[in-house]
C-alpha cells in the first residue's frame, strides 16, 4: 500500500518533466529568412544577403540568410545599386571630346562618369525630345560683353540671354553701336549723358565764334566812318571826263600777248580770249573776244588746267563693281572652295546666316544622303533664291566670328582652280 503513492509520484514527475521540456522546446524559435524583404533575395534554395552597391556577386550563400561572396568592381566599372544576381559590373562611359564634352564627375565603383560642358559652354541636345541620357554636344556661350550688352540670363542649360546695350552704346539695327564722340553730328537719346552736353557746349562755342567777329567788324566799321578823314568829293562832270579819257597805251612783252583759252571739242562752253597782264590773266578787250567773258583775273598758278593743255584722263578704280561677275559666287570650283573653308560643325549655322530658309535645309537633308552633296545643294539653292555675291559670304563668316575662314577663302579664290 505504501508503494502506490511512490509510483504515482514518479509518473507525475515524469509527465511534468516531459511537459516542461516540450514547452521549453516550443519557446525556442528557429531563425526565419523572408525572401520578400529588401535585403534578402532567394538565390537557389536559400535566401541570401545581396551585395552592396559597387560590388558584384562572386558566389551565393551556402546557408539560409547567409552572406554571399561579393567583390569590389574593378577599375572603370561600376554598379550603382544593391546587387543580388549580377556577376559583373557595368563599364563606365567615356565623354565625347569631339562634341567638346568634359567629365564633371569621374567614374567610381558606385557611380558612372557624369559628362557635361565646361564653364562658358552650354548643352545642345542632338534630338528634339531631350532627356538626361540623350546625346548632346557643347556650344560656347554667347559673350554679351563682346556685343556691348547686359547679361539678362547666365548661360547654363541654354545659351546666354543678352539684354539692352551697355552705357555708352545705343541700339542700331541688330547690334549696339558706340555713342558718337564727335559733337557736330546728331546725339541719340540714349547717348545724351555722353555726347549731349558736349554738343551744347560746342554749339555755344560756335555761336560765340560767330558773334565775336560780327561785333568786332561793326566796331571797326563805326570807328572807320567816324574817325577816318573823308576823301574829297568828285563832281559828276569831272567823273564823266575821266571816264572818257582813254588809258595810256602800254607795250606788252611777248609774255603779255593775248592767249586763247581753248575748250574741249565736246564742251558747250564759249571760247574766250584772255590776256596775260604781268603775272595775271585778264579777259581780252571786246574787239578780241569771241564771246562775252566774266571779268576774272587768273594768276599762273590759278590758271585752269584746260587752258594749258588737255585734262588728264581719270584714273579707273582697280576694284570691280559690286554686280560684276568677278564679285559673284560662280558655280563649280568656287562652291567647293566655300565648302572647304567653312567648318563642317558650323555649316548649318553658316547657311542660316546666309539666309537659306530652314525648310530648304531640312528638305536637302531628307533628299540627299552624303553630307558634302548636301553642302553643295544648299549653296546652289541659296544662289537660286537671291543674288549670290562673295560679299555676302564674307559678311556671314565675319558675323559668325570666323575671320580666319574669310582669309582662307580669299586665298583659295585667288589661287583659282
Curated annotation (Swiss-Prot):
A molecular function (GO) term: tumor necrosis factor receptor activity
Pfam families per UniProt: Death
PTM: (Microbial infection) Glycosylated at Arg-352 by enteropathogenic E.coli protein NleB1.
Keywords from the named record: Apoptosis, Cell membrane, Disulfide bond, Glycoprotein, Membrane, Receptor, Repeat, Secreted, Signal, Transmembrane, Transmembrane helix
Matches recorded under InterPro entries: DEATH-like_dom_sf, Death_dom, TNFR/NGFR_Cys_rich_reg, TNFR_25, TNFRSF25_N
UniProt signal peptide: 1-24
Protein's GO biological process: apoptotic process; apoptotic signaling pathway; cell surface receptor signaling pathway; regulation of apoptotic process; signal transduction
GO terms under cellular component: cytosol; extracellular region; plasma membrane
Disulfide linkage: 35-47, 48-61, 51-70, 73-89, 92-107, 95-115, 117-130, 138-155, 141-162, 165-176, 179-191, 187-195
Domain Death: 332-413
Tissue specificity: Abundantly expressed in thymocytes and lymphocytes. Detected in lymphocyte-rich tissues such as thymus, colon, intestine, and spleen. Also found in the prostate.
Outcome of swapping residue 356 to A: Suppresses homodimerization, and TNFR1 interaction
Residue ranges annotated as Cytoplasmic topological domain: 221-417
Entry keyword Magnesium: no
Glycosylation-annotated residues: 67, 106, 352
Subunit-level organization: Homodimer. Interacts strongly via the death domains with TNFRSF1 and TRADD to activate at least two distinct signaling cascades, apoptosis and NF-kappa-B signaling. Interacts with BAG4.
Function: Receptor for TNFSF12/APO3L/TWEAK. Interacts directly with the adapter TRADD. Mediates activation of NF-kappa-B and induces apoptosis. May play a role in regulating lymphocyte homeostasis.
Name of the molecule in the record: Tumor necrosis factor receptor superfamily member 25
Lineage of producing organism: Eukaryota, Metazoa, Chordata, Craniata, Vertebrata
